Amino acid sequence: MEHGDHNPHHGGVVYMYDDMHYEVVLDPGGHHRIYFTEAMREDLPAAVASTVTLTVERPRRSPETLSGVIDQQGESWTFDGQPAAAKDTSVRVAFVVKGSEYWIDVPFIVPAQ
């Protein structure tokens, strides 16, 4: 695969930070995941990042900040929050990698079925 491969492997949306890709899988039911891959899209262990949070911004409601936990397989960060409608909802994705804090605001995009 080329460095330019941004195809989701888990049904989410792929973004980049430095030479690392991360896939954000948002669920309207409130069960979210983030997966990390390296530049060539080989899987990285979830522990490559730390302090991983999602802040869900819904219309006319207070923001909901979710702290992630690494799943039992060590493959992804998982989050459990309140249900969210995609319309007019955004999510701040934040994490620390190699000692550097990073965040980005993204639209709430429901994964492809």
Regions found by a protein language model. Give the residues of each.
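Intrinsically disordered, low-complexity terminal tails/loops enriched in metal-binding residues
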Residues: 1-113
